[in-house]
């Protein structure tokens, strides 16, 4: 990796970064330090490629923390941050490890979150 970095073909980020118009890279800790979650904004909505922050549509409860998250308390806080924004901004969350549910909006119900309306990724324009 050092050779790739030295060649200028790898750019490391230390803060949330705008990659280009419509694509922001945001950092989330917990599963691993500095996990990148791309936020893709279209005229219709923002899509969140959540990686391991919310791996499955059924893991919307903030208390559902993966056993392999290296920092579970941090993971809980980061998951809450992502879910709060997704619910309030009506963002579409893409579940990277879910074989059955590809993408949904998120709805807050009392102190918990759940997958709400399915969103087709074919509609991204």
Set out the residue ranges of the language-model regions.
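Metallo-beta-lactamase
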Residues: 1-27, 76-90
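Active-site-proximal loop/helix segment associated with metal-binding centers of metalloenzymes
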Residues: 1-15, 36, 53, 57-65
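Active-site-proximal beta-strand elements of phosphoester/diester hydrolases
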Residues: 23-29, 48-52
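Histidine-centered divalent metal-coordination motifs
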Residues: 31, 35, 97
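Cap/insert and terminal regions of metallo-dependent hydrolase folds
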Residues: 39, 43-125
